[in-house]
């Protein structure tokens, strides 16, 4: 805080100085009392000041111009920035009274000095120079002080803009923010060199939170300035989140069931929509690893949908949907449960069309990555070690698996909506490619929930729903449940039993001759590799290498799947037979399947009791078989 002391005026006016103030002026006791009557009345808003011409004319160019005619005794300053409070301080300064310049009044005094033309042209050490000195020494070097003064400038438009005070404060905030970022980076570098894992924490009075007091226009200008100065995207994201939470406090609704209970008036919706659209424009650059949290993007999208009444927010909505789609693998179920706009004619609880676009964006991005990887391989040497991006443990495949699990959970959630049409559900269920799901249990659960909630759908729709499920990817528990599920069509139950029988047969065949089975069962899937020089001439080395990689991936997956299936079979093939027999003893289909299971069981027992070449017991033979298969994978 600064204290400005004004020296005595000219000796000719060092005698008694009289004031007669209107009753509307507070703190009248602070003014010196004089027997000299006032010769000027200044009207500022609803307040009147009975003053003397000479002190004001000696320091204010505007008052001097207004009093060019000596007969004038009344002046109206209706547009004075800061109102009567700022003018009172300026008048006291003209009379030589000590006034305190601080964070709360510096903006008013600076604008008042500009409006009253209290510059050095009329008096030395005038109010304009005093306030400028305070700004340079106390305000501009501090981010927090600059933000506070900038906030006070909001009520001083257009004078604060005319004297360039707003722009200078914004530049000061941007420059100091980047300096602080550089200092923080050097501090982290010192920590890393010293081997200390402790990093400086964000202070509780972090300047980014203070920006929430600014109006939308000033806030937007500050963010644009710090972006141009190179402030990192993580900090910008935190600032945007803090400002949004403060500006829209109580308006963000995450639970779609509560959305219908909240009604905003048209003015509130308009204000909310304007804030959200501005925040979306200020978001950092789009990317698959964006610094903007998924939960924040989802909240913005929900608010855009809730407040939009037409296609006016189309670009904003598309931008948010693309951002969410780019990092969909980071989303949770709550992020994609987007409520429908209540103004529409759709009675469903969730916005299915928006989710279809979001998942499509992610899948298209996945295809673009594959093309980029294929293009990248053209310039790589065949013998060079490269990462297998399509393997189950790769980051790319891991993202696809996360998205597929998210889709299954989403389908299970929206399946409970009684107004959801079958076509919408099927469109979502068929959206993901086949390789996105290693196991189809989640999709089966969602379909079963939908059939339970919608028991009156047509048989054709029921059949189309079940066609989205890959029966070969169902687990043993899911197969057992599906075989007894009366909500499924007969074709689905038969298909499940058929593939279960095939898996049993393949597993037992592999126990007899694993190597022969592998190559016989997959010969139709893998292209024939040529070992001669003539054959290799027809295929380029790049295509041949890609084919070998694909064959190895599929072979490893098949061997791993069969190993797991065989282990489960040895433990559970007896219980499967008992469960199928108990489920419906009167059904010929299950009886016949039980008989086949018995035959397969006897065959499996016979094959396991066959003497091995080494003469060991059946348990040792199985152990030897497992060891051989493990070596074959490596």
UniProtKB/Swiss-Prot annotation:
The organism's superkingdom is given as: Eukaryota
Alphabetical GO biological process terms: pollen tube growth; protein ubiquitination
Keywords attached to this entry: Coiled coil, Phosphoprotein, Ubl conjugation pathway
Q: Which residues form a coiled coil?
A: 542-580
Residues recorded with modification Phosphotyrosine: 444
Task: List each copy of the BTB domain by range.
Answer: 38-103
The biological pathway it contributes to is: Protein modification; protein ubiquitination
The keyword Zinc is assigned to this record: no
Domain NPH3 as annotated: residue spans: 205-503
Report the domain remarks.
Answer: The BTB/POZ domain mediates the interaction with some component of ubiquitin ligase complexes.
| Family the entry assigns | Belongs to the NPH3 family.
Q: What does this protein do?
A: May act as a substrate-specific adapter of an E3 ubiquitin-protein ligase complex (CUL3-RBX1-BTB) which mediates the ubiquitination and subsequent proteasomal degradation of target proteins.
Q: What is this protein called?
A: BTB/POZ domain-containing protein At1g03010
What organism does the UniProt record list as the source? Arabidopsis thaliana
